[in-house]
Amino acid sequence: MKKFKIGLVGRIILAMVLGMSLGGILPEKVTRVFTTFNGLFSQFLGFIIPLLIVGLVAPAIADIGKKAGRMLLATTALAYIATLISGFASYCTSAGIFPSLIEVGALTQAQAQANDAAPYFTIEIAPLMGVMTALILAFILGLGMANVRGIALHGVFNDFREIIYRTIGKVIIPLLPLFIFGIALNMAYSGQALAILTVFIKIIGVIFVLHIAVLLFQYCVAGLIARRNPLKLLFRMLPAYFTALGTQSSAATIPVTLRQTVANGVNADVAGFVVPLCATIHLSGSTLKIVACAMAIMLMQGVAIDFTQMAGFILMLGVVMVAAPGVPGGAIMAALGVLHSMLGFGDQEQALMIALYIAMDNFGTACNVTGDGALAVIINRFYKS
């Protein structure tokens, strides 16, 4: 008999529902147990994030530099540009729509009236370095490894990257539902749940429409460059889109994406190079979601949204997304450091970001992999021979 298994999205949603349902029922002593766990887990996240940035970004830059063929550089640059366009499109849409959907300062008002359950104890786990220090160190090491012929340091960082992957996949991701449950439980206990849940529903609706618009834009550009019908190109990629909706994994969708990309007239060698690479480095859908969710939470807190601050955040987020691990929730985990250092997000805001992001994980993944087909069409226009 096949064992029934709930996916990460299902576990996150279940954790939120249970937390918000039980917050007004469970005694304070029980709620404080989960608040204590959340405090410890948040400290661990704060410790691991700088290591995550160094462990992912440095070897990613080194790999790109060592394999610096023209097609690789062109694909990487195109993926970064597509990610930035998606991020800025999300910013413009959110800035125009969210103020009419979200009550400014709703979260701050709820927090002011809240009576949070205090943890039984806390343990401070100081990070080894700040997030910006980690980013600068990652750039220096990555560029250095790309220009130094030795393989020893590169081998060390490949092993370090594998340790980070396993820490995310075996420790952080499995504990996320419990972390989200604790956050939702405390929000319901303190009376903040209803305001936040109402906003969540509105945000998800906007992001769903926005990710469709981004795909249409990408294929219009690809069709214009390749002199092809963009709607036909997009229609042929629908099997990859729906496969990604089901699997929530860019890597698992590669065979379908590859097949449909070739069916779109892309040279098999070009498709075989671009599709697996973009499954790792092209995260337009993920960037779209992170920017929109961040702006929604900032509005809920009554924080003034400054374009220059958000522009810097999107530019840095694009770099982090190129190096994000290909595991469920990997993109948002990689983005936590930038959210904290550039937007000032604390533990509760980061937990809300994780919950929102993973609740829509299939939309983002589908947008990412379907967009890979558009990038392949563009690259094929210049490198098909």
Where are the regions that the model predicts?
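Membrane-water interface of transmembrane alpha-helices in multipass transporters/channels
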Residues: 33, 73, 193-201, 226-238, ...
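Signature of multi-pass transmembrane helix bundles
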Residues: 2-26, 39-48, 70-232
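Hydrophobic alpha-helical segments of integral membrane proteins
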Residues: 30-45, 153-171, 196-200, 204, ...
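Membrane-interface alpha-helices at helix entry/exit sites of multi-pass transporters
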Residues: 69-75, 166-173, 263-279, 305-308, ...
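Juxtamembrane helix-boundary/capping and inter-helix hinge elements in multi-pass membrane proteins
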Residues: 27, 62-70, 99, 146-151, ...
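Helix-loop-helix junctions within the multi-pass membrane cores of secondary transporters/permeases
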Residues: 243-321, 376, 383
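Hydrophobic transmembrane alpha-helical segments of multi-pass transport and channel proteins
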Residues: 44, 80, 84-88, 208-212, ...
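Transmembrane alpha-helical segments and their short flanking loops
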Residues: 291-385
